[in-house]
């Protein structure tokens, strides 16, 4: 497939011979030359790249040589385009130009020769015109034209004043206005056309077209901007404020006009001939003709926002000012990311736009957030119609509400993307007529529908259906201006003043006046009326007579004569409606029937809050005030009665006439009534009926309650009444109701209407009858009947609570009865002795008799009392056997314990809740306050508060009385039963209440709640069965389930049934042995109802296969003996506590063994921090709703895992999607094993910490197959418990059973540690690139220094035993102190390890566990009595010693691991190689992420090549023994003093040679400080200023871009010749290779991403677009210069490194690799480029080349700085030859010629760090060699950058000598005999192969030993020595004495330290 499309003509031309192509090109060049000559002067302004692209796409020619600067080049180019390219095709010599400069007209005439006779008419309109036109301009002056008189002031306009006369004199019919029409209003234009009547009028208009739909900001900011100031527009060309000018906002009306209609009906058509952004060419032609009805504008640099309307703020414009390309790219980019984020979106924006605007940044941030948090929606194929419907429907709501719905957001995003395109709009054109000139303001300041014809709409609304019959108004000319001047002025709106006055009065009465405003201010009233009139613009407030205008006063507007009349008219109604204040009324307030000012007189809270006490008191006042009084009427009737003794309790039946008297008494008023016997009865008002007196006993059909002040009992006939004391509230109540305080006995009576009772109680003993009595009626309706012994009777009644005071003289000889239609409820006060106070119920009110059911269901009779909002009653108890009591503690809180047991709360919390209740009655609050004390007994007030707070019906079964006390609130949710015996409460539950309990467990609520619902909703039969405690049949069970909408899946053992199948909530129950239990979520999978069901909670098979591939598959067969031993230990309480029979009443788990067949499980093992848990955490990211059990041996590990995956802590509600995730400990999980579902995932984490036999126990109890994973590190702490050590200690460990005889992969690389110091100290692999710090660990001595360590190290302390834990806790009480074993699986940032003498006895696994816990660093506190050196010796060979000595290797784990472990660095992957890896690595560099392809690596099957097994020649090599010191003695004298070797610059001195020993821990001192091996070579450091300046001076060359571009231009002609010379030796193929390009791109990105994520993030600043591409940063390379030539030398210049912007590298690097592949594709066999190849390939090539003669080497001086313009010309021709993109070549030219830094601009040269450095250096080296020497073709030549070596003596040639002299590149030729060891890249070349110079290797190994770094680099040194070692005697024979001695010492060091070697090279040095 072609990279770019070519037209057929292009293909044909490319097929021609070059000569033919040149002929065609000449013709095209001539055409282009002529075109450029014509247009260059108009379109040669310097433009930005964006402006170039926009203008070119708009069809505007731009000169390729655009260098002329201008303040606003874009708008100037557009103006020239309209004026010089578009306009000439529409005009001729007949046109008159108006408002144009002479210079522009002359340019136009020079371009168009037919415009020579065009004349210009200019005039002064603005002050700037005086300077705009030339000095020879003469303004016209003339007499006023008659047309001006005809138009009156119409043509007296600045634009027309000096224009009409000259044009009429010239009889101009064709006109052109230059940039002027946008200043004219539509009226001015119509007046002008009406006077001039031109045939054609052309004009240029500058007006932003987007203003037609009213955005306040420009949508083409690259071209222009504008501001709206009032009704004017400030237009800024190119956004340059200083070049802006002001014009009318309405100036664009012609863009929306179709025609113009003059007063006489003449029509002018309007057309837009050309529209380019804000510049338009408009044509106005005379005569009506066909024309379009709509006009379109666009596209703009914006996208429509209509689709996102529901998510936007109301003031957001109709378009987003962001280009379509930006939105499109960012959306597609975010959708391709696996983990999109806002940073990536902003980085992508910076990549697309170098300098984005603030509006673009804001939009991208918000848009990215919207896209990221809302998934895409299908609306085309398989549309999500429900989601779309909900989104559209909810989107109709206000945006502030709509955007909160996810469906609305998803639909909005979908609509936005589906309709995404550059914003444009279509405008409906209108006709501008002379009579409806709106000045174009209508379109701007009002919203109008483009499809509505406003005049027709108004006509239809005004005329109704007959609007169509009315002829439209036709236009006609004016007939003169006289009527306009003489016509009388009339108001447009007339209003009746009388109606206006009425309206004003109503407004005043309702809004300003109040019913209690006694005085009205005259001034206030007048100001009020004036303000109201002023606010209306439709009411005439002035009188006009001719030219005189007179202001009207307010009263004149209202039709009144004076202000007094206004005041009277406004206030005459106020006095009639005035209401007196309460303070003014006094007592009259209570007597008047009219009520006003009643706010606050209700007995309920009117405000938001009110204090309860105030509310209660106020309700009493309200009751008192609201009592009605009527005039009384007393009826006395004498009756004949026989004198006979009567008993008080004798039946007293009132005659019908007496009842009539009672009924009549309902209308009488209270008063003092006298009997015929002079007995007096005084009636009074009961202000409060809340007596607070209860009835306790039954006497002769009445409920009686006795209250005495002295607490004495009284006799009533044969019965003794027990005194209830005398509460303080009773005295208060008596005082409120005006009952005399002399009474000290109160009797509460409650009886039915059938019972007749003399309320004066003559049978009550101990009463002083002469003291009189007071009887209080507590009922609202009733009547007192008084019988006199003389035969008189009185009927005294009242409609409300009354009291009757019987005077002392009527105590004898009278009877008093109470009659009512309901229950009688009275209180009788009598005189006796003083009685003491006792707290009782103080707010009881009888509410009626009980006619309900008792416990047994039999009818019971009792009395209901309203006790503070709770109805209290009492009835006989029956059926106590239906309940079972639960024993409770008798600690004084037994009642609270009972309540707490029934409701499931803590008793103290429940007590605090209930005792905090506030009653309406103060006495109850006092009594409740006493219950708050600790150990206080519960009173009735506490029970009432509990009933109210819990909304519970409380039934107290009193064992002493055999009755049930019932307390029921008005709203109840549950029923609670208590047993009271001997002042001790116990909770009662129904016998056989398993149904209630099962339903409660299923719904997660309390039994009491379920019971209350059952009693309320179920039928009587079910309720009786429940209350009887006899159990329920299945039919009744189904009825109960129906109440809660539960589908009950019931397992009956032999069968399964479903109850209430129509319910909504399915639950499983088990019914066996007449007992029902809830199965919960742990459904038994054996149950047929769920067995085999596809429950949809299984993980995807692909995800599990990937996971299983990371571990070892094991067919595990459970051992019932091992499982049984662990089960017995747990049953006995030796192992754990949850499975104990003693502590938790558990059964032995042996009974649950059901499985003896094998189960496939997978073991995933790896070292600490290897990512084992991360595998499952990643799995859970896609496990929403899936079933998983994660088991941890430690509670801390379980909680840590919960926090990591985002699960709630214990007791919290599970998040959506996590309902089926269970994180448990090992004991809790055993209770779930038998209920696991088939196929679910079970993970046993930290498998080495489980007790022996645990895996056998789990598998033995499994009823179904599950996906079981064992995860852990067998090398860490194992299980150990002192309690079961004797029982389980003899059993084999779990790890040995599972892995003992198997070979398995063990991941040895750890990702936990971020400190380089841990490398070599821990037995694992640590990637150095992952480490971000390099800090040594801290070592402290003695316990007292524990307090001195840094705070971060004090947070966690690890100890080896529990005894040490106590010691550390005493010193650091705030620290988290853990034993080594307890810390297993946990990770900390910093911490401390405490070492004591006991620590020595800790096994290796626990030591490994402790040392691996800390990511950053750790501190040791040594309290063992030994120093650290002694400690290392004492622990020799152990993990602790290897940590201190830095000698740990992964092989140390072999002794701790069971079976045969195969160490691997990574877990294997099955499918999707590298998926998401790139994106994760680039998380810290969002800018680079936009430059890198994020696709995954292709799956390529690697072909296995057969390995050739050859018998290598081997024999022993005898090396002469030579000590290291004797080797050193041969050259030590060559080391000069430091002061002679360093370089001085001013007062600065270089620092390249060391003279001190290193302070690195573990370093070895091989020599004295001044003669260290490191001193042999210079060391360059980035901090060495002198070394850096030396590098700048030697290796960099500076120039300026202009000079370098000129040099390159002159050198470009040599490029093709150089390339042809190169192609003679290396015949490159020019065709494009797609595979090479893909591989090159992939290889570059892989190399770029091979660094760690931390390193990439640290260099993210290089990716930001704020770093200019043509600016680089210069560094000096930090390195030890270990070339052989650098031994014993003085200081040398550093190697400079240039740091480029990442965009530059990503631009060029893939193509450089592509060129390299093209070179390697055709490279001859005898040429070798050492790039991307190993030493084995070099060795094999050298053997083929037979380097056995005189060889040629080239040594270049300043090679990089010598890569001048001639070499670059060769590079450019090479890129063109390989058909690389031309824009890439231009970018390469730009970078090479324009690159600069803080030091200045560079000349053309090569830089280290440039993408093409090595490749082009090598190619330049090859080209120079081909031109410098006579190459025959059979030479073997190897190249690598600036290094070259040929196998023969190459003869120089003079053929290109003249050209080579021009090059900066110079070479020193060396001819080396093979015995003198020719060198290439530091390797000696010989016929037998390659080998490294031994002195270099030895000295570098000694330097590593001095730095304690040998373990990190010995592999590399061993590889270098191995080539000479394998050559044996062949290499020794070519070495001199010094080299042999060095070679021996190299081999000796390697053999002694071969245990540090990690690679296979170790085998070379092992003895066969």
Curated annotation (Swiss-Prot):
Domain (+)RNA virus helicase ATP-binding stretches: 1134-1316
Q: Where does ATP bind?
A: 1166-1173
A GO term for molecular function:
ATP binding
> How would you describe the post-translational modification of this protein?
Specific enzymatic cleavages by the viral protease yield mature proteins.
Catalytic residues per the record? 994, 1075
All residue ranges annotated as the RdRp catalytic domain in the record: 1749-1856
Residues in (+)RNA virus helicase C-terminal domain copies: 1317-1454
Reaction(s) catalysed by this chain, per the record, are: RNA(n) + a ribonucleoside 5'-triphosphate = RNA(n+1) + diphosphate; ATP + H2O = ADP + phosphate + H(+)
GO annotations under biological process? DNA-templated transcription; methylation; mRNA modification; proteolysis; RNA processing; viral RNA genome replication
Entry keyword set = ATP-binding, Dioxygenase, Helicase, Hydrolase, Methyltransferase, Multifunctional enzyme, Nucleotide-binding, Nucleotidyltransferase, Oxidoreductase, Protease, RNA-directed RNA polymerase, Thiol protease, Transferase, Viral RNA replication
Q: What range(s) does the Peptidase C23 domain occupy?
A: 990-1080
EC number(s) on file:
2.1.1.-, 1.14.11.-, 3.4.22.-, 2.7.7.48
The segment(s) forming the Alphavirus-like MT domain are: 63-254
Site annotation (Cleavage): which residues?
Answer: 1472-1473
| Lineage: superkingdom | Viruses
Instruction: Decide whether keyword Iron-sulfur is in the record.
Output: no
Q: Which Pfam families match?
A: Peptidase_C23 (PF05379), RdRP_2 (PF00978), Viral_helicase1 (PF01443), Vmethyltransf (PF01660)
Q: Which residues form the OTU domain?
A: 883-991
Q: What family does the database annotate?
A: Belongs to the potexviruses/carlaviruses RNA replication protein family.
- Write the protein's name: RNA replication polyprotein
The species this protein belongs to is: Potato virus M (strain Russian)
Taxonomic lineage of the native organism: Viruses, Riboviria, Orthornavirae, Kitrinoviricota, Alsuviricetes
